[in-house]
Amino acid sequence: LMIKISNLSKSFSGQTVLDHLNLDIQKGEVVALIGSSGAGKSTFLRSLNYLETPDSGSIQIDDFKVDFSQITQEEILTLRRKLSMVFQQFNLFERRTALDNVKEGLVVVKKLSDEEATEIAKEELAKVGLSDREQHYPRHLSGGQKQRVAIARALAMKPDVLLLDEPTSALDPELVGEVERSIANAAKSGQTMVLVSHDMSFVAQVADKVLFLDKGKIIESGTP
């Protein structure tokens, strides 16, 4: 077992968004969350690495366990190192090249040397098919390329789990395939992932387990 999420709850102004969710995720498993808009899918993802503050519950990743009701600053940092997130909007540094965007976390968070960080960043950009775009700034990249840089940046951190929140929803239809291929390749390489997507054919292609969320509860789970 890789991750155990227990009793995860969250409400906004009295409205329950996550209702005592429990979930076990195995190492190397790709779990997809589906459900209508407002079902709590993005809040669930963002709560896992404390971008949203859960009201209660805990998460255990291997032997690292955090109780959300009494989490410390140090635990938040550790949690974010273990869980890397890719958002709908690419969140790249506009004034840095693709390569520097991928390197940033390796140097700042992981304290790697510039040389080591560059090597890893180049490897990850190659995996998403962007070796020829290393020196390009985001403004010179298509939406699909930007999202692939964001995926490379997340994977460069060697997270225990990759969290993907609607990674293709901001893209033009013709760019979706290239991003989905990058995610599918990461899944094949054994990367554990939790993914929110509206694209059911993509979910069927990459997910090992699909959870249907409604009103903050998992009401159904199965294989695609």
Where are these regions (language model features)?
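Helix N-cap at the start of a conserved alpha-helix in ABC-type nucleotide-binding domains
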Residues: 173-175
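Conserved ABC ATPase signature
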Residues: 137-141, 145
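A short, surface-exposed alpha-helical micro-motif characterized by mixed small hydrophobic
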Residues: 203-205
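A short, proline-enriched helix->beta-strand linker immediately N-terminal to the Walker B motif
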Residues: 156-160
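H-loop/switch region of ABC-family ATPase nucleotide-binding domains
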Residues: 197-198
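Catalytic Walker B motif of ABC-type/P-loop ATPase nucleotide-binding domains
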Residues: 162-165
